[in-house]
Amino acid sequence: DTPSDWSXFTRYTYK
């Protein structure tokens, strides 16, 4: 999954 906001990508689980 690619988060729209890479500025806060840490909020998402990097896959």
From Swiss-Prot:
It is found in: Secreted. The keyword Metal-binding does not apply. This is Protocetin subunit alpha. Expressed by the venom gland. Its main location: secreted. Belongs to the snaclec family. The lineage of its organism: Eukaryota, Metazoa, Chordata, Craniata, Vertebrata. GO terms for cellular component: extracellular region. It comes from the Eukaryota. The keyword Glycosyltransferase does not apply. Keywords: Secreted.
